[in-house]
Amino acid sequence: MTHTQTKGIEISVSSWFRNDLFTEADSNFFYNYEITIRNRLSYPVKLLSREWHVLHLLHGISTISGEGVVGETPTLVPGQEFSYTSGCELIVSMGMMYGKFFFKDLTSEELFYADIPAFSLIYPVLLN
């Protein structure tokens, strides 16, 4: 699990390989990741959007952005956390993801971002 904290927003990430979706003939690699976002600030914030950078080892970086996460734009009051699980498909056996969540301070209306820490996506056979 990896963690980071930016401007009072703490983000934790864990990831795992989806062996149940893998076939050697298909040669695509599926991973899930769980994100937990904690509001360590003294005021409420709303998650507006996300920006992901997905590194496919030896094949470059793709960027994915969009509104909210898993169809939601959660509001987090001070001390509250929000968790969700999502997935990623790689065209190679190893990669990495990192990015940013964009928030609005619901007290001042100020917009800001929090970094999503980099985390590895590795086909487990490569670790043996």
Where are these regions (language model features)?
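Low-complexity, acidic Ser/Thr/Pro/Gly-rich terminal tails and inter-domain linkers that flank the onset
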Residues: M1-S27
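Short glycine/serine/proline-enriched coil/turn segments at secondary-structure junctions
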Residues: F22-T23, P44, I91-G95
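Short, solvent-exposed loop/turn segments enriched in Ser/Thr/Gly
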Residues: N28-E34, Y98
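Asparagine-centered strand-capping/turn motif at beta-strand->loop junctions
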Residues: I37-L41
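Short acidic, flexible loop segments centered on an aromatic residue
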Residues: Y43-S62
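Short, surface-exposed linear segments at secondary-structure transitions and domain or protein termini
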Residues: H56-H59, E72-E81, L121-N128
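Intrinsically disordered, low-complexity Pro/Gly/Ser/Thr-rich segments with frequent PxxP/GP/PP motifs
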Residues: S62-M94
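Terminal connector regions
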Residues: E89-N128
